[in-house]
Curated annotation (Swiss-Prot):
Glycosylation site positions: N99
Organism whose genome encodes this protein: Saccharomyces cerevisiae (strain ATCC 204508 / S288c) (Baker's yeast)
Membrane topology: Multi-pass membrane protein
Stretches in topological domain Cytoplasmic: 1-3, 54-76, 129-132, 188-254, 323-329, 377-442
Phosphoserine, modified sites: S209
One Pfam family, short name: UAA
SUPFAM superfamilies xrefs: Multidrug resistance efflux transporter EmrE
Protein name in the entry: Putative nucleotide-sugar transporter YMD8
The keyword RNA-binding is assigned to this record: no
Sequence intervals crossing the membrane: 4-24, 33-53, 77-97, 108-128, 133-153, 167-187, 255-275, 302-322, 330-350, 356-376
Protein family membership: Belongs to the TPT transporter family. SLC35C subfamily.
Molecular function, one GO term: antiporter activity
Gene, per the UniProt record: YMD8
Main location per the UniProt record: Golgi
Length: 442
């Protein structure tokens, strides 16, 4: 990937991710933000926007995607119940709890604690025998939770401060629950990949032809891969679309949206209160406390509700473009920098503060543990010799995704908290395409 293009995608990733985090905190913060009391309902609108955008994107940029939920003129309940529903419910819980937590915890604490999902990945990985127990991994989990405890620790004798601290602790548990669901979702995806090996017809055909999709050209000064037209044409004849996380988003978003909407109706009971909240009302008293609902305030409210959906969509495009061509270690390093920048911008823009030595120590411990985890994973990857997968050259060094032939084996994909969801959406789309091919062959 050209360096300028790579930096552009990284900037887009940083901007969308950091802006989205700050936006969500501002939207739900009851003290210094809009204080919207219906975070689960608001998240439902995000999913509706994602579904529409992903549908438009697939229509404009990709070949028609076969509906894996249709099987022999009927509904493919097996794929829906086994793959889509568990992933969608876990994702809805992850995102929903994250947004609810913004009512109680600052962005700085949220960002650092969210990194603890690595600990849940390791824990569940060992329980389900995806991970081989190693004392270094166990120590990493323990250190991670020690860091989380220090992040929320705030000694004080003031009653009001104790009440605030209780809310922060409650919000921190919500973030931990969100991280737990994130870890469970990752482990479940890996179990599905292990039990459903991905073998594409296109890959097999190219292999049988003893040809590569890309060839070397001695006259190519930049030593860039050149498309092997014969085998590329072979791929086109199959008429299959390339796996892409946007395909999965289009399938998951409606299920997540319905799950979140039902949860909101049962727990938040948002109607009719949402219409009198600050998101649909404007201050009309020139500095006073009077507000009213106008056409302008309604338009503003709708824009505020759908804007995060656009941010998540662009975020996914940038993440996937980086993952296609960038080694896992590089992605992890770039992701760690993004987390640090999120904390810094939270301090600058939202005027948040890490109060006291213990909070700073907790943040440093967690970030150091995340760095060590990624280094440990990198060393493991070198030993296990993961194969790369790339849309341009699958003979290059390790990239963010595994080769098709590795999926479903006893090896598992490297986990990165920064691009966790995009990785799993990509993997789930490969499972979907594999299931679709299998059902057509029956």
């Amino acid at each position: 990937m050209n360096r300028t293009v790579f930096l552009a995608f990284v900037f887009g990733w940083y901007f969308c991710s950091i802006a989205l985090s700050i936006y969500n905190r501002w939207m739900f913060d009851p003290k210094d933000g809009l204080g919207i009391g219906y975070p689960v309902l608001v998240t439902t609108f995000h999913q509706a926007t994602l579904w529409l955008l992903s549908g438009i994107y697939i229509k404009l940029r990709h070949k028609p995607v076969k509906n894996v939920l249709r099987k022999n003129n009927g509904f493919n309940w097996s794929f829906f119940l086994k793959f889509l529903l568990p992933t969608a419910v876990a994702s809805a819980g992850d995102i929903g709890l994250s947004n609810v937590s913004f009512q109680y915890v600052p962005l700085t604490i949220y960002t650092i604690i969210k990194s603890s999902s690595i600990a849940f990945v390791l824990l569940f990985g060992c329980i389900f025998k995806l991970e081989k127990f190693h004392w270094k991994l166990a120590l990493s989990v323990i250190i991670m939770f020690v860091g989380v405890a220090l992040m929320v620790f705030k000694p004080s004798d003031s009653t009001s401060t104790k009440n605030d601290q209780a809310l922060v602790i409650f919000g921190s548990f919500l973030v931990l629950a969100s991280s737990c669901l994130s870890g469970l979702r990752w482990v479940y995806t890996q179990l599905m990949l292990r039990n459903n090996p991905i073998q594409t017809n296109t890959a097999a055909a190219v292999e049988e032809s003893d040809g590569a999709l890309f060839t070397e050209n001695e006259d190519n000064v930049d030593n860039e891969p050149v498309v092997n037209l014969a085998n590329n044409k072979m791929l086109e004849n199959f008429g299959e679309s390339k796996p892409h996380p946007i395909h999965t988003i289009h399938q998951l978003a409606p299920i997540m949206g319905i799950t979140l909407l039902l949860t909101s109706l049962l727990v938040e009971k948002p109607f009719p209160g949402i219409f009198s909240s600050s998101i649909f009302r404007l201050d009309t008293s020139n500095g006073g406390v009077g507000t009213e609902t106008t056409v302008l305030s309604i338009v503003r409210g709708i824009v505020l509700l759908i804007l995060p959906g656009f941010a998540v969509f662009l975020l996914t495009i940038c993440e996937f473009s980086i993952l296609e061509q960038t080694p896992v270690l590089t992605v992890s390093i770039v992701g760690i920098v993004k987390e640090l920048l999120t904390v810094i911008f939270g301090i600058i823009i939202l005027s948040e503060r890490l109060s006291g030595f213990y909070n700073w120590l907790g943040m440093l411990i967690i970030m150091a543990d995340v760095c060590y985890y990624n280094y440990f994973r990198y060393k493991q990857d070198l030993l296990q010799k993961y194969h790369s997968v790339s849309t341009q050259d699958n003979r290059n060094e390790l990239k963010g995704f595994q080769d098709f032939e590795q999926l479903g084996s006893k090896k598992i994909a490297p986990y990165s908290i920064s691009v966790d969801l995009t990785n799993q959406e990509y993997e789930l789309d490969m499972i979907a395409q594999n299931v679709s091919r299998s059902s057509q062959q029956v």
